[in-house]
Design a protein with these regions (language model features):
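Hydrophobic, aromatic-enriched interface-forming segments
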Residues: 112-114
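Surface-exposed interaction regions that form or flank ligand-binding interfaces
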Residues: 212
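Conserved G/P- and acidic residue-centered "switch" motifs that form tight phosphate/ATP-binding loops
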Residues: 109
Length: 249
């Protein structure tokens, strides 16, 4: 079976430079995929042209800065961190284009939030001031590979299937989180304080987590297995699409 091509969204910093933590593309390569980083194109026509040329199989929305609250029709609150409207526009356009092509999507941390906002949901801009929870630790100071809280997955969900467990110790690096869940998405993972840690739309092969599995792969077969399982699902979807195209030719 051909290795699936995975689009990775990138970050844009204050100096207008593209950047990405290497764990994202390393995780894809180790799991049997081919990563391709997409530049921050702003026009939908440019995104469509790029996708037509690349012929990718799936999209991974990576982590990064806060999401500008104007994207979900709210005004900023005290505690909001750095935002990048440029990145918001780029990723929202990219997600829409990939979904129209029926591509599987994986969101990580900020990526989960982008998916929820794109589909009509909203966010708590700052967990501490708006949600009032300090029980679970969501902005850890420990090394990123260290688990600081546990996520409970719904039995029979994509989350449980991909991670092959119902209870998963994870890291945590966020202060925004899901508030109103988009209608098409299902919450499949939470922490004990009620913070949403996994969202999914199985019929569209859309899955997202609030934590960073890519940073916990070293010596952790569960996190490595997650990426392998996801890449296998992507490859299966791509194979089915190609078979259908061949039948119609």
């Amino acid at each position: 079976m051909e290795k699936p091509v995975i689009i990775l969204s990138c970050d844009v910093n204050e100096r207008d430079r593209m950047r990405m933590r290497q764990e994202y593309f390393e995780a894809v390569i180790e799991a049997g995929g081919v990563p391709v980083v997409m530049p921050p194109l702003m026009l939908r026509s440019q995104i469509d042209e790029w996708l037509d040329r690349i012929d990718a199989d799936a999209l991974m929305l990576t982590g990064g800065c806060d999401i500008d609250p104007q994207t979900f029709r709210e005004t900023p609150v005290r505690g909001l961190g750095r935002v990048s409207l440029q990145r918001d526009v780029y990723e929202l356009g990219l997600l829409e284009a990939c979904m129209l092509r029926g591509m599987p999507v994986l969101g990580i941390c900020r990526g989960l939030q982008v998916i929820n906002v794109a589909l009509g949901g909203s966010l708590y801009q700052d967990i501490l001031s708006q949600m009032g929870t300090e029980f679970a630790r969501h902005q850890q100071k420990e090394p990123t590979e260290v688990a600081t809280h546990e996520v409970a997955f719904i039995a029979g969900s994509m989350a449980e299937n991909l991670f092959q467990t119902q209870f998963l110790p994870t890291n945590s690096h966020h202060h925004q989180c899901v508030h109103r869940v988009a209608d098409d998405l299902t919450v499949s993972g939470t922490t004990v304080d009620g913070v949403v840690e996994a969202l999914e739309w199985p019929e569209r092969e859309i899955f997202a987590v609030q934590f960073h599995p890519e940073r916990m792969r070293d010596g952790n077969p569960t996190m490595c297995g997650f990426f392998k399982n996801w890449i296998e699902r992507v490859a299966a979807v791509a194979s089915t699409k190609k078979s259908e195209i061949a039948k119609n030719d």
